[in-house]
Amino acid sequence: MAFISTPLGKVTVKSATVSANRRGLRMQSDSEPVVSRRALLSGALAAAVAAALARARPAQARIDYEGIGYLGGGDKIDVNNANVRAYRKFPGLYPTAAKKIVQGGPYGTPDDILKNPELSERDKEVIKKYMDRFVALPPTPEYFTDRVNNGIYK
């Protein structure tokens, strides 16, 4: 009696033979196989089809956003879509006033920033100093949701 180890556990076999030829070792037994060849191949085919159908799809992100220059890389900042870190280039705004600006949006015009009840008088003075450097473009979901924390850390 022999024990043959398979993926499904050990199988008891009355007799087993092992022979060698040019292609390698071959093992034979007198018992029925635990898994038929047809079941094994159809399972492998099903797994391959499932893997092909579940492959990753490309992101449908918009890469040609017309306001990209106003997100912090230029001289002007879009108050509706720019991240809070974009205000670092304006002394006195980052982080406190910038956070209040970002959380108070969206704005119709840059002047609407001054209507934010969270701003102190000092914040408003500093904002007025840079008012000509702000634009208010329509909020876009791709950037509006990441204004406070866009996940980029330096």
From Swiss-Prot:
Task: Give the family per the record.
Answer: Belongs to the PsbU family.
A Pfam family of the record is PsbU
**Gene from which this protein is expressed:** psbU
Name of the protein described by the UniProt record: Photosystem II extrinsic protein U, chloroplastic
Q: Does the keyword Cell cycle apply?
A: no
What role does this protein play?
One of the extrinsic, lumenal subunits of photosystem II (PSII). PSII is a light-driven water plastoquinone oxidoreductase, using light energy to abstract electrons from H(2)O, generating a proton gradient subsequently used for ATP formation. The extrinsic proteins stabilize the structure of photosystem II oxygen-evolving complex (OEC), the ion environment of oxygen evolution and protect the OEC against heat-induced inactivation.
> Which positions form the organelle transit peptide?
1-36, 37-61
How is it placed in the membrane, per its record? Peripheral membrane protein
Listed A to Z, the keywords are: Chloroplast, Electron transport, Membrane, Photosynthesis, Photosystem II, Plastid, Thylakoid, Transit peptide, Transport
> What's one GO BP annotation on this UniProt entry?
photosystem II stabilization
Q: What is its main location?
A: plastid
InterPro entries (UniProt xref): PSII_PsbU, TAT_signal
Q: Where in the cell is it found?
A: Plastid, Chloroplast thylakoid membrane
Q: How does it assemble?
A: PSII is composed of 1 copy each of membrane proteins PsbA, PsbB, PsbC, PsbD, PsbE, PsbF, PsbH, PsbI, PsbJ, PsbK, PsbL, PsbM, PsbT, PsbY, PsbZ, Psb30/Ycf12, at least 3 peripheral proteins of the oxygen-evolving complex and a large number of cofactors. It forms dimeric complexes. The extrinsic subunits in red algae are PsbO (OEC33), PsbQ', cytochrome c-550 and PsbU.
Q: Name one GO cellular component term.
A: photosystem II
Q: How is it modified after translation?
A: Predicted to be translocated into the thylakoid lumen by the Tat system. The position of the first transit peptide cleavage has not been experimentally proven.
